[in-house]
């Protein structure tokens, strides 16, 4: 009798655990569309000459422009918080607009990610872009944010398979976070200037 009970528990319990986790919510589907039909990519090849498109992909879109000096920490954070979690999906990708003159800096950043954390960069795309292309595409998102003088922003954006910008539009902490970020930047500028 004990053997049958133990065997029953060993078979039924994993099945119940699987059913519990399989019924989990897909939070991405609940994100509202903030901007429908954003502009498609003005460039269809990355620095490594690989084809890239937003259509039919779930994309994390970043605008790093000519400001790559301090992006290693952001890249590592994005890798840990987002990429490692969703890397198994074939249609998931990171796409970054980068100044077309920054190929060496992009390669150094990629090397740091690969050697430091062993990141698989097959779904990371760095697009060589002109400032005009970066600005034009960023404006198609219609967000309240601005690019800095280097055509860069610390924010990343979620774009769905149909080129819709997704995200939260009721974030109570957004203004507070923006003010805090601006204060941090101002402190950094003051420390560099003095």
Please describe what each predicted stretch is.
Residues 73-127, 131-137:
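Structural microenvironment flanking redox-active thiols in thiol-disulfide oxidoreductases
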Residues 55, 89-92, 151-154:
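Extracytoplasmic
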Residues 138-146, 161-164:
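Short, surface-exposed amphipathic charged segments that create phosphate/polyanion-binding patches used
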Residues 150-194:
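Thiol-/selenol-based redox modules, centered on thioredoxin-like
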């Amino acid at each position: 009798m004990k053997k049958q009970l133990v065997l029953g528990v060993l078979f039924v319990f994993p099945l119940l655990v699987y059913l519990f986790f399989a019924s989990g919510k897909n939070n991405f589907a609940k994100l509202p569309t903030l901007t429908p039909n954003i502009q498609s990519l003005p460039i269809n090849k990355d620095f490594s000459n690989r084809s890239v498109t937003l259509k039919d992909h779930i994309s994390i879109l970043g605008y790093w422009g000519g400001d790559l000096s301090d992006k290693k920490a952001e890249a590592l954070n994005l890798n840990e918080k987002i990429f490692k979690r969703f890397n198994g999906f074939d249609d998931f990708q990171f796409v970054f607009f980068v100044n077309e003159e920054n190929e060496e800096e992009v390669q150094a950043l990629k090397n740091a990610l690969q050697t430091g954390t062993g990141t698989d960069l097959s779904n990371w795309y760095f697009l060589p872009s002109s400032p005009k292309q970066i600005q034009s595409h960023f404006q198609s998102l219609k967000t309240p944010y601005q690019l800095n003088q280097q055509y860069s922003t610390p924010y990343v954006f979620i774009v769905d398979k149909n080129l819709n910008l997704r995200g939260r539009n009721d974030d109570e902490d957004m203004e507070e976070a923006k003010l805090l970020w601006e204060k941090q930047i101002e402190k950094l500028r003051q420390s560099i200037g003095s």
